[in-house]
Amino acid sequence: SPGERVVTIETAAELRLQHGHVVRLETRPPSIEGTGELGVRDLMINSLRMRPDRIIVGEVRGAEALDLLQAMNAGRDGSMGTIHANSPADALARLEVMALSAGMGLSSRPVREQIAAAIDLVIHIVRLRDGSRRVVHVSEVTGMEGDTIMVSDLFDWYQTHVDSEGFAQGVFRPTGIVPRAIHRIEDIGIYQPP
């Protein structure tokens, strides 16, 4: 909504959000003397003092993953970040490893529980051989089963052919799984056709 405060955290400011209340934070390298560095984790912690409604981290690469998960589990719905991974499940596994690197002495189980509670959707984008980028999976995190974070693909992209100019063509199709969060989706005005 227009009144929401969105805080973006990036190594190099690239996001150009069309929103009225955006606070843009950018990392800073250390000075020649080796002081004054502001990393993503520093900015993540400082952003929480700004009373954000949503936090967007340009790229989650390390211990800031734990801070982002905690923020997401404390009412900052719609927060997001990017992670380089080979699949939605791999992205969640990488997020776990990064959160564990925060040095808080946590074991895997509570971190996985935080991930399962915080993350609703994983959007997987790949770069194809032709250089184009495609969303190939929209997956929902459905909770935990034992020690495993459960993920269900809601949509996937299937390559049908390569056109005469060498570009991959395909179809983005629903898998038939109705999202568990369908009521929350409808509450914000997005309806699934019957």
Regions found by a protein language model. Give the residues of each.
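NTP-binding/hydrolysis catalytic cores, primarily Walker-type P-loop NTPases
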Residues: 131-194
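Conserved P-loop NTPase nucleotide-binding/switch module
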Residues: 9-23, 47-146
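Post-Walker A helix-loop "phosphate-sensing" segment adjacent to the P-loop in P-loop NTPases
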Residues: 1-7
